Amino acid sequence: VSANVSASTAVVVGASSGLGRALATELAQRGHALLLVASDARDLQAIAADLELRFDARVATLALDLAREADPGARILAALAKLPPLSALLLVAGVSYDDDDFSLSAARIGELLSINLHAPHAIVHALLPKLRATRGTIVLCGSIAAARGRGRNVVYASAKRALESLHESLRQAHAPNELRAQLYRLGFLATNLTYGIKLPMTAGDPDVVARTIAARLGKGSFARYLPRRFALVAAIARALPWFAFRRMRG
């Protein structure tokens, strides 16, 4: 299906690298018109040109700094004005800091919360009427880090756990008749963020994860781990007695 005659638009927030870029490619290939949102305009332009050439896709872009934008939802709404009706919102953008171990300044805590929590809430609130009108899908990206709080990724994990509450609120208030709310608790993925880092498990392939997410758009509301093997890791972490868990401070 050519995206030039596509009946609907998917918004990918965090579209310039890793899973977001893989999702942009997968959705373009499936015939969606796209609004790609990321912080770097040049990266977005290059991705859009590639997707337009390879898939005859209709692609709009919006450069947005989620750490500093007070109302990202309003900016995205304005960018959607000339695109087909909105059918999917995929909130992939996220950031973590190596020193998120109770060492962060107030300013850097604010940056983490702006990107990982404020922006998803603001964007969902702004786009909710459009998504309800089309019975669309909201995809939130959580993290295995939220399974149990540790002395690392303190703010990041707190924000990701809060997204679990947002997902539950969307399901309770609007699913299944008005929209679909899908939460993916992501494990380690092979991206530039994990390159060169010694990981405790084999990282997942962003292209494979993107295909799974794209294939499930519109197919119910749920929360699940991706890659699926990380569900066992999270279950073990939650089941550990406190005396054992508290020793895992590395």
Task: Label the predicted regions.
Residues 92-98:
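Conserved NAD(P)H cofactor-binding loop of Rossmann-fold oxidoreductase domains
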Residues 124, 159:
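Active-site helix of classical SDR
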Residues 143:
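Residue(s) in the substrate-gating loop at a strand-loop-helix junction
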Residues 183-184, 198-234:
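C-terminal helical subdomain
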Residues 100-113:
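Substrate-binding pocket helix/loop in short-chain dehydrogenase/reductase
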Residues 16-17:
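Conserved glycine-rich cofactor-binding loop
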Residues 32-47:
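Conserved glycine-rich Rossmann-like NAD(P)H-binding loop of the short-chain dehydrogenase/reductase
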